[in-house]
Regions:
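Regulatory modules associated with amino-acid/nitrogen control
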Residues: 1-91, 126
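A short linear hydrophobic-aromatic micro-motif
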Residues: 38, 97-102
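Charge-rich, low-aromatic oligomerization/scaffolding segments with amphipathic character
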Residues: 43-46, 118-134
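Helix N-cap motif at beta-to-alpha junctions
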Residues: 55-58, 114-119
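Generic beta-strand structural signal
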Residues: 70-72, 96-98, 109
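Generic non-transmembrane alpha-helical segments
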Residues: 92, 96-98, 124-128
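Structural preference for solvent-exposed beta-strand-turn elements
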Residues: 106-108, 117
Length: 134
């Protein structure tokens, strides 16, 4: 099934969902430290392997982190070639003073916001979906 490309439909249908838990970004030289670990996301950078993990797993492994995030999923099936969705949610959250780290999955966009900002971020995203001015 093809993802949605219409920005108006994407915004109206984004249906943001706050997932349970606290998540952290860690940088590792390689995957060897991640035995028996549920990695939510990863990206290879020049400096090392960035992984997104539940906070409890990072602490159990003794991994350092600087940022504790809440994870919000936009439940609309957005096409990877869709134009404007990232700009729309990043702009709305930025206008509200909320930092956002976005990751596009095959089906959905996933946003990581500071744990303390999760409630406000959900409110901003729900207002954006409803077409309300920020």
């Amino acid at each position: 099934m093809a993802g949605e490309t219409s920005l108006a439909t994407l915004l109206r249908s984004m249906s943001p969902q706050l997932n349970d838990g606290e998540y952290v970004f860690c940088s590792l030289p390689d995957r060897s430290l991640l035995q028996d670990c549920e990695v939510l996301g990863s990206f290879r950078e020049r400096e090392g392997l960035t992984v997104i993990l539940p906070r409890q797993q990072a602490e159990r492994l003794g991994l350092g982190f600087d940022y504790v995030a809440a994870w919000i999923t936009l439940n609309v099936h957005s096409a990877l070639e869709a134009v404007g969705l990232t700009a729309a949610f990043a702009g709305a959250l930025g206008k509200a003073g909320i930092s956002c780290n976005g990751i596009a999955g095959y089906y959905h966009d996933h946003l990581f916001v500071g744990q303390a900002d999760a409630g406000r971020a959900m409110q901003v995203l729900q207002q954006l979906a409803a077409g309300e001015e920020q």
